[in-house]
Amino acid sequence: MEFTLEATSKNARACTIKTAHSTIKTPVFMPVGTLGSVKALDMEDVLDLLGAEIILANTYHMYLRPGDETVAKMGKLHGFTTYPKSFLTDSGGFQAFSLSDISKASENGIEFRSHIDGSKHFFTPKKVIDIQHNLGSDIMMILDDLVALPATGERIALSIERTTAWAKESIEYFRKKQKEGIGAEQNIFAIIQGGTDKAFRTKSATELCALDFDGFAIGGLSVGELNNEMYDTVEHTVKYMPKDKPRYLMGVGTPEDLIENIERGIDMFDCVMPTRNARNGTLFTSFGRLNIKGATYKEDAQPVDSECECLTCKRYSRAYLNHLFRSREIAYFRLATIHNLHYYLNLMREAREAILEDKYAEFKAEFYRKRG
């Protein structure tokens, strides 16, 4: 991986990340393709209509079905899906924790039952790296010990202790495998934990950022805390993260969350919100959210967003999308998803331009002004 910090606008950063498969301009939003597919889209949509240079797939889900060994036999993620750009794979720890009826973390890893058939599995730091070697992602995440908030200080301290221990095991194993010729073109990120407690975040960030990772993520946020708590936690944590490596805020979030956290120095984001909300009838626009299922749009000839250049807005009216949604037509899900993801990715491109011109504060003010 080649990382270049090109410009800053106060704490906001414009960077370039070069992997074996693409050049990623930051700030970047990564569409979520949990199962190796961005819901409702094909890879032509992702490439040609969205211009996405990186998408996310999930280790837990790909491990359970179709199986990481199957993916490896089919040409790894790039060959299996035909997406030629970069993949980031989450370690699967969050899904093992949240989707399993029975999930137990110990000092050795996470035991869980499959949400598909109830079979028992055990993720260790080394196993999730082996799985991600089979998947062939450009950026892999380590196994971390996730804590649901609110949590006791004792439990958060244990989470940090385990995450640091697993990180040390992970980076040692990953670099050893690279010397053996396995995963030579892959990169690995660590995940900082600590809830919303600044002392815990300092401890976790300090311990992890001393290790030889290619980038660092902030995990354990957007799990029910107040927005200001999230923003304060991010602002504090980035102070302890290196300036010469990517910074990734996991699972976040709304357009407002992206704007606020770019200002605080975050480079990379992912979230299911634009795709999930599209399917549920909520569309994101330059002027705020639009609930397309509302009767007010039944005879509205305007595009979803007059400032948007996506295929959906160039060709179709709000009335047509309202009709498709109410009729539960499959075409709706594609058109709505194209719009929402285009909005997110374009917002990142505009943010980048503002940073390059050292006008991020003005860009942020205009973003909120349009929302009234």
UniProtKB/Swiss-Prot annotation:
It comes from Sulfurimonas denitrificans (strain ATCC 33889 / DSM 1251). Belongs to the queuine tRNA-ribosyltransferase family. Binds 1 zinc ion per subunit. Zn(2+) binds at residues 308, 310, 313, 339. One of its GO terms (cellular component) is cytosol. It holds the Pfam family TGT. GO terms for biological process: queuosine biosynthetic process; tRNA-guanine transglycosylation. The lineage of its organism: Bacteria, Pseudomonadati, Campylobacterota, Epsilonproteobacteria, Campylobacterales. Keywords: Glycosyltransferase, Metal-binding, Queuosine biosynthesis, Transferase, tRNA processing, Zinc. This is Queuine tRNA-ribosyltransferase. Its cofactor is Zn(2+). Homodimer. Within each dimer, one monomer is responsible for RNA recognition and catalysis, while the other monomer binds to the replacement base PreQ1. The gene is tgt.
